[in-house]
Amino acid sequence: MPRKGYIAKREILPDPIYKNRVLTKFINQIMLDGKKGTAESICYNAFELIQEKTGKDPIEVFETALKNVMPVLEVKARRVGGANYQVPIEVRADRRQTLGLRWLVGYARKRSEKTMEERIAGELMDAANNTGGSIKKKEDTHKMAEANKAFAHYRW
């Protein structure tokens, strides 16, 4: 932990096309090796694919997908008297969003479609419909928290 207090969070600029800050975070999550232009083109092409396939506004699909993927509870390891307990805790709003974005991109990368645009589009559409890998991850996280509810009194 820092001794001189906490560092202020950097302000994230909204993306150039949709003027959305959360979308900028999503693009940053897609980005590899600092290639932001490539990440932006992947994201915007994926949004065009979503527009073609669903006929809905891609930003709405993205926001619905993110809302469906964001976890409410997670478990954190806590050592008590020589034993490690998985203690369920509520997820802070900023971490909830970060985890949702990370899971969406992570499970999109694991998909079998040919291009990254197709993978991102597929994962976003699946998550908006409450299916797909990222939704399964959220459900597994919630199941773990539910299974370890008995240790909730170890919260700190």
UniProtKB/Swiss-Prot annotation:
Organism field: Desulfitobacterium hafniense (strain Y51)
HAMAP family membership: Ribosomal_uS7_B
Pfam families: Ribosomal_S7
Keywords: Ribonucleoprotein, Ribosomal protein, RNA-binding, rRNA-binding, tRNA-binding
Function in brief: One of the primary rRNA binding proteins, it binds directly to 16S rRNA where it nucleates assembly of the head domain of the 30S subunit. Is located at the subunit interface close to the decoding center, probably blocks exit of the E-site tRNA.
GO molecular function terms attached to this record: rRNA binding; structural constituent of ribosome; tRNA binding
Protein name (database record): Small ribosomal subunit protein uS7
Stated family: Belongs to the universal ribosomal protein uS7 family.
Entry-linked InterPro entries: Ribosomal_uS7, Ribosomal_uS7_bac/org-type, Ribosomal_uS7_CS, Ribosomal_uS7_dom, Ribosomal_uS7_dom_sf
The keyword Lipid biosynthesis is annotated on this UniProt entry: no
SUPFAM superfamilies cross-referenced by the UniProt entry: Ribosomal protein S7 (SSF47973)
GO cellular component, one term: small ribosomal subunit
A single BP term in Gene Ontology: translation
NCBIfam families: rpsG_bact
Subunit structure: Part of the 30S ribosomal subunit. Contacts proteins S9 and S11.
